[in-house]
Amino acid sequence: LMKKFRVKHGSNEPAAYAVCALKKLKIEPKENEKIYYGVFDFGGGTTDFDFGIWKNSEDEDMFDYELEHFGAGGDIHLGGENILKELAYKVFSDNTPELRKRKIQYVRPEWCPELSGEEILVEYTREAKLNTRKLGEEKLRDIWEEKETERIDNVLVNLFNADGSLETGIDLKINEEELKALIKDKIEKGIKNFFIKMEDAFKDEDVKKVHIFLAGNSCRHSFVNEIFEKYVAEMKDKMELVIYDLKAIKEIDKENDSKITGKTGVAYGLIYSRKGGRIKVTNRDEKENMANEVNFKFYVGNNRRNKFNCVISPNSNYNEYKFFGIVKSDIFELYYSTSPEAQTNEMKSSEAKIKRVNLKKDYDDEEERYRIYLKADKSDKLTYAIVKEEKDIETKKLVEEGEISLN
């Protein structure tokens, strides 16, 4: 039996969900019509975006439909469980005097900036991780899942101190309005990035209408529909947005025992788009980068007046040098981010990560203007090259060359 067992690369999850939703909702393309779609997959760990075109297959003997998807992106930090971690961090940060007195430590999420005075409180020990999990799971999940019926001003929680002993009945103040504002801000930023990425994905298309499918259990939050409806109103003169939330998808098969959900929708989509099926799924990004399975993962740039100035993006071609700037010493700094907002050149540079690259020699010579170029080599790797004149990058007359890893 195992000799017949095969594992094959199929559609990604958002594309598979789109296949299922388009088929189940009976969104039928007319002859030569392109139907544009987007998927906002807001899960527990991350949020994924996917965009594409649904159309009738040109080869009717082989397929009924073709789905071409492209412009995939997302937010690796926007997810229900990550929001819980950030809520816990916010509550801990608002109660530092009590925590310091009891020697209680907690975890700061990697995407949150360091706050002054928390040096001895933030740790990554087993106890610190347990404290963050306990506060989030036991006391803050109801706020995130909108289950609380009465206002919460404080919680009593048992936490571990730095010595590993359990401290009982710790009274932590909670500002529920601030926690809800944090949730809304996180979701709003994620949806803003979705639309930035959508405009970029469809920039070469004449788009009048887009079907948007909300997937992932975190899309149940009321702020998600509220913010998407705001975009529907704001963009009505530009294009029509049709939003399908989880409830709309579930209603498709309400009489069927095997109802469509965020998870089963992906499974059905993978079945519909399997090899030998009647739906052909193609990934434009993979076709354009035949030697590389995925696009470059980051937005890379420099700091211009405290704004992120984008030089390389996930749309950039591999092995194509881009001018980065003038090098002035034996070190240069680059900024990088996974947020689609980075491509607008309006994002604060402080919201990106910074990478300092040590060079092989010092270029502190005001009479010579050495130019530095960057190119993407792999999904998370760059090469830099330093030249004296612009023409030298074409002739490969390099003064210095090196690799940069963004892992």
Show where each model-derived region lies.
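Nucleotide/phosphate-binding catalytic cleft detector across ATP-hydrolyzing
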Residues: L1-G38
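Conserved phosphate-binding/catalytic loops in two-lobed NTP-binding clefts
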Residues: L1-N12, E229-A267
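Acidic low-complexity intrinsically disordered segments
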Residues: S165-A181, D185, S273-N407
